């Protein structure tokens, strides 16, 4: 049985490995997705200049999702649309998705689907 420490260390290593590969290619900004116990957040980061181009989270007062929860699949899809709109205002159309070591399923898949529907390409 895998204990919690080994599982979290494996996740961190996966995230660092994939983040290194994304930074190495470096032609497009990264779309970073993160989930906490209460909220979801994302940001578009330009690694060459070292700046955050756009940021969105479900803890914002202006955020409104279809459901009551701010961390479910519906909220993730709305968050994807919101970050795509903010990115397009800054002139960002193509990004690379940084999943932070998480598998592409559930909230991350819904987030990516919402961002693609709103015009981001990755």
Curated annotation (Swiss-Prot):
Alphabetized UniProt keyword annotations: Ribonucleoprotein, Ribosomal protein, RNA-binding, rRNA-binding
The keyword RNA-binding appears for this protein: yes
GO cellular component: cytosolic large ribosomal subunit
GO terms assigned for molecular function: 5S rRNA binding; structural constituent of ribosome
A GO biological-process term: translation
Cited NCBIfam families: L18_bact
Quaternary structure and interacting proteins, as annotated: Part of the 50S ribosomal subunit; part of the 5S rRNA/L5/L18/L25 subcomplex. Contacts the 5S and 23S rRNAs.
Chain's role: This is one of the proteins that bind and probably mediate the attachment of the 5S RNA into the large ribosomal subunit, where it forms part of the central protuberance.
Family membership noted in the UniProt record: Belongs to the universal ribosomal protein uL18 family.
Full protein name: Large ribosomal subunit protein uL18
Organism expressing this protein natively: Leptospira borgpetersenii serovar Hardjo-bovis (strain JB197)
């Amino acid at each position: 049985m895998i204990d919690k420490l080994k599982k979290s260390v494996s996740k961190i290593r996966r995230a660092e490995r994939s983040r290194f590969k994304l930074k190495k290619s470096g032609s497009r900004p990264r779309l970073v997705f993160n989930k906490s116990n209460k909220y979801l957040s994302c940001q578009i980061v330009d690694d060459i200049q070292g700046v955050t181009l756009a940021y969105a989270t479900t803890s914002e007062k202006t955020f409104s999702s279809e459901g009551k929860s701010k961390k479910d699949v519906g909220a993730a899809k709305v968050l994807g649309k919101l970050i795509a709109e903010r990115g397009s205002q800054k002139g960002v159309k193509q990004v690379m998705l940084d999943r932070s070591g998480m598998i592409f399923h559930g909230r991350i898949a819904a987030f990516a689907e919402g961002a693609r529907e709103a015009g981001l390409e990755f």
